[in-house]
Curated annotation (Swiss-Prot):
Subunit structure: Homotetramer, a dimer of dimers. One homotetramer interacts with 1 SecA dimer.
Keyword Cytoplasm (UniProt): yes
The protein's role, per its UniProt record: One of the proteins required for the normal export of preproteins out of the cell cytoplasm. It is a molecular chaperone that binds to a subset of precursor proteins, maintaining them in a translocation-competent state. It also specifically binds to its receptor SecA.
Keyword Electron transport applies: no
Gene this chain is encoded by: secB
Name by which UniProt lists this protein: Protein-export protein SecB
Organism: Hyphomonas neptunium (strain ATCC 15444)
């Protein structure tokens, strides 16, 4: 461990040689779809079904490059009538350096989507507004809780898969 001052900063001469870093190299829309099968309602409060998914994969170039994808889907309905369906796959190219092996997955599935989310949220709001509806403003997402939930589900699937093989 390094010595720290009262402010929590490393003392002079004790700076880490290679601190972990996360760089955003680019952000882009991979896929965007908006379907408006009906017309915008005049006074109907629609039921909104939201879906959020996060994925990450190493980039072909290597060098600590990863593509992180944030998928947002929204389906609005009033009764049995579908008002709109919006789907967005928004991605970023990130470079991780000097991140400990055990922290890479959490960095990719928590911190990277946290950086992408405000931009994806704005795109969803604009596309619903352009579709003739009030802008859909998605509440902030707790990516730590989402990561923990995905991690638990993966562990349960692995346990159930191994349990069935015995």
């Amino acid at each position: 461990m390094t010595d720290t001052s009262a402010a929590g900063n490393p003392t002079p001469g004790q700076q880490p040689a290679n601190p972990p870093s996360l760089r955003v190299l680019g952000q882009y829309v991979k896929d965007l779809s908006f379907e408006n099968p009906g017309h915008p309602p005049v006074q109907t409060q629609p039921n909104i079904d939201l879906g959020i998914d996060v994925g990450a994969s190493p980039h072909a170039d290597g060098n600590g490059l990863f593509e992180v994808s944030l998928k947002l889907s929204a389906k609005a309905s009033a009764g049995d009538t579908v008002l709109f369906i919006s789907e967005l796959d928004y991605a970023g190219l990130f470079q991780l350096q000097n991140v400990p092996e055990g922290q890479v997955e959490a960095m990719l599935l928590i911190e990277c989507p946290r950086l992408l989310f405000p931009f994806a949220r704005r795109i969803i709001a604009e596309i619903t507004r352009e579709g003739g509806f009030p802008p859909l403003l998605i509440d902030p997402v707790d990516f730590v809780a989402l990561y923990q939930s995905q991690y638990r589900r993966a562990a349960e699937r692995a346990q159930n898969g191994n349990g069935g093989a015995s």
